[in-house]
């Protein structure tokens, strides 16, 4: 039976969040609502989730000794990774010593890079995926491209938000795609995955929650990407019953293999009734921001319940809903947002401004949310709200 104490007291139930972006911020808010004491950790100060946590620490999260020192000092009941770039070997060791990692340290380790999770899905679980090769050198990469043919996709095995990702259409793209992948990898230069291109009709995120009562699926989330980075998402994505059933089978297989409890974002390619596994995040997913307006329990509320061992008896979906990101380009440490009244002038709209302390280049700084009578209308409304926001750098 779940028992939650009083924050900042000897009975407190403590959660330590590793990574403090906008997704972590919403998770912290949901945990706070349930009376949990939250400690936020990231590599930079004043990150979004730090602004709503009880306290925070700034460390290099790829430094295992620094991560261990914070965890041993704070003694959290639950360690919750919010990003991939963490010293996962340290999480594995801490889990073996009795700490609880959400969903599991193995899940964090396998999903830290694309190779671990792709080999699990394709080679161990025999799930349908695109054809693929891994390469460490330009020579091996060139051979893989030749073998798979054009078009194909190259990505660093360790990167997020589309960084370093390219679609190769001809031999002219081979060198520049390699160079871009080497620049975009999270741990610096290195290994890449080359994938055969699937001519899919659409892609979805199937938000899958493993909780005390079993496994529950949210309605499928459709999304549009640019350069591998999410621009808008909507729910529910229309699918054939056959494709939806197969999507749930694939999502259940991969989340069961990763184990533990929590919310997972399972990315899938769909063509007609066919489904291919793409990737999985063992945590809330950026495309799932739409659930802040589309469901009675957002993906963040679901994650909080699952972490704490609370049941999810039912998820109510409110009908056609959409999200559109507020993307800011430039440089500033004091970004301001204006014209918000116009952005919120239509019924069934909402905004989330993430409170990121700086922008240097291009950065997602907020999201507009909307509901309407159809997906098309909801998408258009969310986009209008997003575009109405005036950004002052």
From Swiss-Prot:
User: Which residues participate in Mg(2+) binding?
Assistant: 267, 279
Sorted keywords for this record are: ATP-binding, Ligase, Magnesium, Metal-binding, Nucleotide-binding, Purine biosynthesis
Q: Which InterPro entries match?
A: ATP-grasp, ATP-grasp_carboxylate-amine, ATP_grasp_subdomain_1, PreATP-grasp_dom_sf, PurT, PurT/PurK_preATP-grasp, PurT_C
Query: Is the keyword ATP-binding assigned to this protein?
Result: yes
Please list the coiled coil stretches: none
Question: Its Gene Ontology molecular function terms?
Answer: ATP binding; magnesium ion binding; phosphoribosylglycinamide formyltransferase 2 activity; phosphoribosylglycinamide formyltransferase activity
Mind telling me which Pfam families this protein's record contains?
Answer: ATP-grasp, PurT_C, RS_preATP-grasp-like
Q: What residues does ATP bind to?
A: 114, 155, 160-165, 195-198, 203
One GO BP annotation of this record: 'de novo' IMP biosynthetic process
Ranges for domain ATP-grasp: 119-308
Q: Which pathway does it operate in?
A: Purine metabolism; IMP biosynthesis via de novo pathway; N(2)-formyl-N(1)-(5-phospho-D-ribosyl)glycinamide from N(1)-(5-phospho-D-ribosyl)glycinamide (formate route): step 1/1
Question: For this protein, what reaction is catalysed?
Answer: N(1)-(5-phospho-beta-D-ribosyl)glycinamide + formate + ATP = N(2)-formyl-N(1)-(5-phospho-beta-D-ribosyl)glycinamide + ADP + phosphate + H(+)
Q: Which GO terms describe its cellular component?
A: cytosol
This entry's Enzyme Commission designation comes to 6.3.1.21
Q: Does the keyword Ligase apply?
A: yes
Binding of N(1)-(5-phospho-beta-D-ribosyl)glycinamide: at which residues? 22-23, 82, 286, 356, 363-364
Cross-referenced NCBIfam families: PRK09288.1, purT
**Assembly and interaction partners:** Homodimer.
What is the similarity comment for this entry? Answer: Belongs to the PurK/PurT family.
Its annotated function is as follows:
Involved in the de novo purine biosynthesis. Catalyzes the transfer of formate to 5-phospho-ribosyl-glycinamide (GAR), producing 5-phospho-ribosyl-N-formylglycinamide (FGAR). Formate is provided by PurU via hydrolysis of 10-formyl-tetrahydrofolate.
- Protein name per Swiss-Prot or TrEMBL: Formate-dependent phosphoribosylglycinamide formyltransferase
């Amino acid at each position: 039976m779940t028992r939650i104490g009083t924050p900042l007291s000897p009975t407190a139930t403590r959660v330590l969040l590793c990574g403090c972006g906008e997704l972590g911020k919403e998770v912290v808010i949901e945990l706070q609502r349930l009376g949990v004491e939250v400690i936020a950790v990231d590599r930079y100060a004043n990150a979004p989730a730090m602004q709503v946590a009880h306290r925070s620490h700034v460390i290099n999260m790829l430094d295992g000794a620094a991560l261990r020192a914070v965890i041993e000092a704070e003694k959290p009941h639950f360690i919750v990774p919010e990003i991939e770039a963490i010293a996962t070997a340290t999480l594995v060791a801490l889990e073996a010593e009795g700490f609880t990692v959400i969903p599991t340290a193995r899940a964090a380790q396998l999903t830290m890079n694309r190779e671990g999770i792709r080999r699990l899905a394709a080679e161990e679980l025999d799930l349908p995926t695109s054809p693929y090769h891994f390469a460490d050198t330009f020579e091996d990469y060139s051979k893989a491209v030749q073998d798979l043919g054009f078009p194909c996709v190259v990505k660093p095995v360790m990167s997020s938000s589309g960084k370093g990702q390219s679609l190769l259409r001809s031999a002219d793209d081979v060198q520049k795609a390699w160079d871009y992948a080497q620049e975009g990898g999270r741990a610096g230069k290195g290994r890449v995955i080359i994938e055969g291109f699937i001519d899919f009709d659409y892609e979805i995120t199937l938000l899958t929650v493993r909780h005390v009562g079993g496994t529950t699926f949210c309605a499928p989330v459709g999304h549009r990407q640019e350069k591998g980075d999410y621009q808008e998402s909507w729910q529910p994505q229309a699918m054939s019953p056959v494709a939806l059933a197969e999507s749930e089978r694939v999502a259940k297989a991969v989340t069961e293999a990763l184990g533990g409890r929590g919310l997972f974002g399972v990315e899938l390619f769909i063509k007609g009734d066919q489904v291919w596994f793409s990737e999985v995040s063992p945590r809330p997913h950026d495309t799932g921001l739409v659930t802040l307006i589309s469901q009675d329990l957002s993906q963040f509320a679901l994650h909080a319940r699952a972490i704490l061992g609370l049941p999810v008896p039912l998820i109510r979906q409110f009908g056609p809903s959409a999200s559109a990101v507020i993307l800011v380009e430039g440089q500033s440490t004091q970004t301001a947002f204006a014209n918000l009244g116009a952005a919120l002038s239509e019924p069934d709209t909402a905004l989330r401004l993430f409170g990121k302390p700086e922008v240097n280049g291009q950065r997602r700084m907020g999201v507009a949310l909307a509901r309407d009578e159809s997906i098309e209308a909801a998408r258009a409304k969310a986009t209008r709200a997003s575009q109405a926001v005036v950004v002052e750098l």
